[in-house]
Design a protein with these regions (language model features):
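Hydrophobic transmembrane alpha-helices
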Residues: 2-52, 57-61
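Short helix-perturbing small/polar motifs within transmembrane alpha-helices
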Residues: 2-3, 75-128, 174, 178
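Residue-level signature of transmembrane alpha-helical entry/exit and packing/kink sites
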Residues: 12-17, 43, 58-59, 83, ...
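Hydrophobic core of alpha-helical transmembrane segments in multi-pass integral membrane proteins
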Residues: 18-28, 94-101, 170-175
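Aromatic-anchored segments of alpha-helical transmembrane domains
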Residues: 21-30, 64-76, 124-133
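Alpha-helical membrane segments and adjacent membrane-interface helices in multi-pass membrane proteins
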Residues: 36-99
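Membrane-embedded alpha-helical hairpins and interfacial helices in multi-pass inner-membrane proteins
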Residues: 108-191
Length: 191
């Protein structure tokens, strides 16, 4: 099978950075669906950044934005000390892993549905486990549940939400590929 990857143009990069920034602001404020925000899509957005932007300066840009949102807009029932603790390092590691998996997918074949789903499953499970377990073990809060119960607490919701985001991403990528191929075909036919 021919390896297919995609290198965006400058205009595509600007558009993608703007879209990712918008959706980080739209989804990062809450982990759940509220009247003001969609469920958190950060891991999938970092995955997209790794796929198409690749450069680590953009990873740093999105990390700063995410950190700023967490710092400046904690949920009313929580304070910054609850959110920003040593366990937060796991979230940063999960974002970095999401970016790396996106880069890897683009290098291997971004349009292979089988690879896309395999890497997406790895993304969802590993990002959840890393961020949840580091919070459990390294946060300063006293968690009354066992580690097993704590991990299972939000996994189903996290898995469903991120699977929906991954499916939306796959449809967008396949649509883009279809339009890109038809655009190239129409340019060739017009010559």
């Amino acid at each position: 099978m021919k390896k297919i990857n995609h290198i965006p143009t400058n205009l595509e990069k600007i558009l993608l950075i703007s879209i990712l920034t918008f959706f980080i602001f739209l989804t990062r404020g809450s982990h759940l669906l509220t009247s003001f925000s969609l469920p958190d899509a950060s891991f999938v957005l970092f995955f997209v950044g790794g796929m198409f932007l690749k450069e680590y300066k953009w990873l740093c840009y999105f990390l700063v934005i995410s950190f700023g949102i967490d710092l400046l807009s904690p949920p009313p029932e929580l304070d910054n000390l609850y959110l920003l603790n040593l366990g937060y390092v796991g979230l940063i590691i999960s974002y970095f892993l999401s970016w790396i998996l996106g880069e890897y997918l683009n290098r291997t074949s971004i349009f292979s549905t089988k690879k896309f789903f395999a890497i997406s499953l790895l993304l969802i499970v590993s990002s959840y486990l890393i961020s949840t377990l580091t919070f459990y073990y390294f946060s300063a809060s006293q968690i009354q549940q066992s580690v097993y119960d704590f991990v299972l607490l939000y996994f189903r919701e996290f898995f469903i939400v991120n699977t929906v985001y991954i499916l939306i991403l796959l449809v967008l990528i396949k649509t883009y590929l279809y339009v890109l191929r038809n655009d190239k075909v129409s340019k060739i036919e017009s010559i």
